[in-house]
């Protein structure tokens, strides 16, 4: 009977260790995925601000050109 108790305890202990390792790996994978998402969103923000600045400069240049054309008339 004592042998069965020890065997059962060993099986349960090894199962808990295995589960703990799996959960730790899952957490690490989730952290890596979140970090990749953060890096991608930073890149998108940088790209969006560049596009916005180019659009502003183009609008200003177009406005100056239009005012210059009106001033020549």
From Swiss-Prot:
Pro-sequence residue ranges: 23-43, 72-73
Biased composition (Acidic residues): 30-40
Annotated tissue distribution: Expressed by the skin glands.
GO biological process, one term: defense response to bacterium
Keywords of the record: Amidation, Amphibian defense peptide, Antibiotic, Antimicrobial, Cleavage on pair of basic residues, Secreted, Signal
Stretches for region Disordered: 25-45
Secretion signal, residue range per the UniProt entry: 1-22
InterPro entries per record: Dermaseptin_dom, Frog_antimicrobial_propeptide, FSAP
Compartment(s) where it occurs, according to its Swiss-Prot or TrEMBL record: Secreted
GO annotation, cellular component aspect: extracellular region
Sequence positions bearing Leucine amide: 70
Family: Belongs to the frog skin active peptide (FSAP) family. Dermaseptin subfamily.
Function as written in the Swiss-Prot or TrEMBL entry: Has antibacterial activity against the Gram-negative bacteria E.coli ATCC 11775 (MIC=0.8 uM), and the Gram-positive bacteria S.aureus ATCC 12600 (MIC=0.4 uM) and M.luteus ATCC 49732 (MIC=0.8 uM). Does not inhibit the growth of the fungus C.albicans. Probably acts by disturbing membrane functions with its amphipathic structure.
Protein name: Dermaseptin-H4
């Amino acid at each position: 009977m004592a042998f069965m108790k020890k065997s059962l305890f060993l099986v349960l202990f090894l199962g808990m260790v295995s589960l703990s390792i799996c959960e730790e790996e899952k957490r690490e994978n989730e952290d890596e995925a979140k970090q990749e998402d953060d890096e991608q969103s930073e890149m998108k923000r940088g790209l969006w601000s560049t596009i916005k600045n180019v659009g502003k400069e183009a609008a200003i240049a177009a406005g100056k050109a239009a005012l210059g054309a009106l001033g020549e008339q």
